[in-house]
Amino acid sequence: ETKQTFDLREGIESTVLILQHRLKANERRPAIEVVTDYGNIPHIACFPGQLNQVFMNILANAVDVLDETSSHQSYRDLEVKSQSITIRTRVEKNWVEVAISDNGPGIPDEVKAKIFDHLFTTKDIGQGTGLGLAIARQIVEEKHGGTLTVQSALGQGTEFCIRLPIGDD
């Protein structure tokens, strides 16, 4: 399997499109807003299908968290402070960065410490496998020579940052 030149923005957009039905308003909450701030990033050599899986895992988790949070808030409160996912891309030296953040409740430190562990999940039995973020990190680090990190504080939301090298290796 060889790497292909790929526009990450296209991968992100197609993933958001797949999740569109989950972002729409429902009886429990208004629509989740997706805000994009695409910096001018180059196409990179990568395995597009694998990176799309990474985007899907992170974005689907963000939707899960916001869905879960909305069950503890009134529709009106959610209209006032809308739930959102922000996707930013930029070039930082020889890296392309994709940052995906939500304005959910944030992650406690003890969960953050284990978030990329194989089989670790905070979801109810039958809801999560504990594989999504472990696989996402493996794809980014082992297959692409990049990094996948998380920053979060309780009450401050969560941001996952994917950094991928620009170049051919």
Language-model region placement:
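Short helix N-cap motif at coil->helix boundaries in the Bergerat
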Residues: 8, 106-114, 128
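Short alpha-helical Gxxx[C/S/T] motif in the catalytic ATP-binding
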Residues: 132, 136-137
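A conserved beta-strand-to-alpha-helix junction within the catalytic ATP-binding
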Residues: 4-17, 35
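ATP-lid-like helix-loop hinge signature
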Residues: 2-4, 24-31, 63-96
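Conserved catalytic submotifs in the C-terminal HATPase_c
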Residues: 28-43
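Glycine-rich ATP-binding loops of the HATPase_c
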Residues: 144-151
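Detector for a conserved hydrophobic position within an alpha-helical segment of the HATPase_c
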Residues: 140-141
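Conserved micro-motifs of the catalytic ATP-binding
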Residues: 1, 43-46, 122
